[in-house]
Amino acid sequence: MLEFPISVLLGCLVAVKAQTTFPNFESDVLNEHNKFRALHVDTAPLTWSDTLATYAQNYADQYDCSGVLTHSDGPYGENLALGYTDTGAVDAWYGEISKYNYSNPGFSESTGHFTQVVWKSTAEIGCGYKYCGTTWNNYIVCSYNPPGNYLGEFAEEVEPLISTVSSSSSSSSSTSTTSDTVSTISSSIMPAVAQGYTTTVSSAASSSSLKSTTINPAKTATLTASSSTVITSSTESVGSSTVSSASSSSVTTSYATSSSTVVSSDATSSTTTTSSVATSSSTTSSDPTSSTAAASSSDPASSSAAASSSASTENAASSSSAISSSSSMVSAPLSSTLTTSTASSRSVTSNSVNSVKFANTTVFSAQTTSSVSASLSSSVAADDIQGSTSKEATSSVSEHTSIVTSATNAAQYATRLGSSSRSSSGAVSSSAVSQSVLNSVIAVNTDVSVTSVSSTAHTTKDTATTSVTASESITSETAQASSSTEKNISNSAATSSSIYSNSASVSGHGVTYAAEYAITSEQSSALATSVPATNCSSIVKTTTLENSSTTTITAITKSTTTLATTANNSTRAATAVTIDPTLDPTDNSASPTDNAKHTSTYGSSSTGASLDSLRTTTSISVSSNTTQLVSTCTSESDYSDSPSFAISTATTTESNLITNTITASCSTDSNFPTSAASSTDETAFTRTISTSCSTLNGASTQTSELTTSPMKTNTVVPASSFPSTTTTCLENDDTAFSSIYTEVNAATIINPGETSSLASDFATSEKPNEPTSVKSTSNEGTSSTTTTYQQTVATLYAKPSSTSLGARTTTGSNGRSTTSQQDGSAMHQPTSSIYTQLKEGTSTTAKLSAYEGAATPLSIFQCNSLAGTIAAFVVAVLFAF
């Protein structure tokens, strides 16, 4: 459905007497519109909008009176006219109804003004005008909101005239000495079907034919009610006496229909019929030779049915019908001799059909037999009036869209019988009414006047049965479509499609129909998250997205060739993402990256044709299913690629001052590769990112030194006599690096009274498990010793197990693992005078050399903060000296 209104045509220019002003312009134009809208079914009156009127008047004021009409192309619907009065323009627009074809509703250049005037959804109007002199007279502009003339909505928005939905009846009567009056009454409310509707009722004595074709055959039938009554009577005369009998009978059937719209997503209804009969008879005679019998019966019946269906949008419809029938007085004056008998037989049959979406049938039959003999007493009996009502209503919940196609335009719209539903429910109700009425005896006394009244009360029995069924089918087959015909008498087609949960059935009888069903199901899931232990952390995430859609199109027309196409498209996409960050930098192998893409397409087509003497039907079924599976795996590994580092400690003595210098260095880069690979049609793309070794807290060097004056003579302590202890605490930072970051450092020697100078002592090593070089330089008047301590891989990179003695491991939401040491743990037993804090948050290495073997409290060396590290360093130096 297009979401823009089609511009309506321009008004025609006619010559009328000029009128320059319209004092009651607003009310006249509004009333003229509403007068015409009131002629159509369910079309509400318009209201005046000052906003629309201002818009229309502004556009009218801009007109150049050139005689050329051009639309404003604004947001509203619009009608233009030139040369008319205010109401004359509306009359001219509505006059296009004579050219509108309700059998083929749609937009036409010759009816665009009319359809905008009566467009059911339009609620507001505003108009303006401009006088263009004696040549063109008045220029009229009317704006409508919401606008009309939308493609695909004409059948629903342009309602037929109320007069076309009417009830018609005809009757005739005749009287003779040998035949009673026979009358036929037919009343119907016709459905709007494409082929029209014809009702013919006939009897022996009279006949009547009723034919009604609605003006809008495209609208779906909402109510069908028809009734026919045939009364026959015969009289037989025996003997030579003369019998005169006159009787009259009339049956009046009236129908009252009403419809209402109920918004409901799923509703079922049952039909109930109630009936009551009151019967009385009386006889009053003052004449011994005459008698009068009067019988009256009333049988009001009411029936209501409500059906609702739920589609992609909620639609519900309910209708109710009230049916009442009555038989008026039957009288027969009798005069006869004792040798003459008169018998009459009457049969009354009434048939009423109500249709609301589905079939509701009410059948009522009554048969009355009476015989009268000319004697001192006569009797009239009417027994066993029985009626039964059975009704069946089904409702379904479905998701579907109907599309009508016809190559020959034989039938643009059709009646659809059947339903397509994911789940369906039905309600069946039946009721039976049994009546026994009118059992009266009339006594006539020839000698005296006798009045006798006798009546029998009616009996009514109602039975009701209701059953509700629900069904649901789940299959994984592709859609199939088939169609068949039988000698142009009936058309039937069955369409089933199922991807996930759906079943559909469409059938028709003698009509053309078309339907389209589209079902889409989506499923997504996220699965499998695991974290392996020991030296690495792995996270696996799998996301699966499955999309499947089924489209079924079935079309059958009255043309000689019918094309039915079924398409089944199913797409499935699965995406798997694997992230495997490895904590061990010595493991230089990246996790494998798996990529896969699989696309499979399969389909089948078949063509079948059947030929008979009346019609040829060709059925073509095409089924295709496409499945696409795309899997992408991304693996990430975090480690440091062969970092080399060294830590050296130098002790220099000069002028009775001892300078202790510790230097941390990092001589090579540490790589952080991240590989992301994907494959499309067996072509892989890989990107690797390398990151260099980080600096120490953002600085290029880091040096810790302390110069003190000893209490004794200068002494150079050999480096080999220094015992050493290495303690490493590992933590995960935001980048998940696990290596120890150090940098080359040039020591600064501070001598009292002298200018500080840079020391040239530093040590490097290419690999963590190789000994670092030792360099020693002697300055003038000074002696120095540099000792480099080797740290092994096992000490530097060991990840404490969560089961180690005294260890405490905490895992946060970011997936990082932090290991800390509790008090009393054997992992921390430092005795040192020098302490170096490396890159905070990554690793902490304490290089401790004991001069005097003094122990330091354990709580200082918990590697928890920089403050604790500095305190440890100061305490260690004080103990050393």
From Swiss-Prot:
Induction: Expressed specifically in daughter cells through activation by the transcription factor ACE2. STE12 represses expression of the full-length transcript and induces expression of the short form. STE12-binding to pheromone response elements (PREs) at positions -175 and -161 prevents SPT15 from binding TATA-box 1 and thus it binds TATA-box 2 at position +385 and directs internal transcription initiation at position +452. Residues 1-18 form the signal peptide. It is found in: Secreted, Cell wall; Membrane. Glycans are attached at N101, N360, N488, N535, N547, N569, N625. It is a lipid-anchor; GPI-anchor. CDD domains: CAP_PRY1-like (cd05384). Residues 386-400, 585-594, 821-830 have a biased composition (Polar residues). Residues 262-313, 381-400, 453-494, 579-611, 758-788, 800-830 are annotated as: Disordered. Residues 854-881 form a propeptide. InterPro entries: Allrgn_V5/Tpx1_CS, CAP_dom, CAP_sf, CRISP-related. Keywords: Cell wall, Glycoprotein, GPI-anchor, Lipid transport, Lipoprotein, Membrane, Secreted, Signal, Transport. SMART domains: SCP. Belongs to the CRISP family. This is Cell wall protein PRY3. The lineage of its organism: Eukaryota, Fungi, Dikarya, Ascomycota, Saccharomycotina.
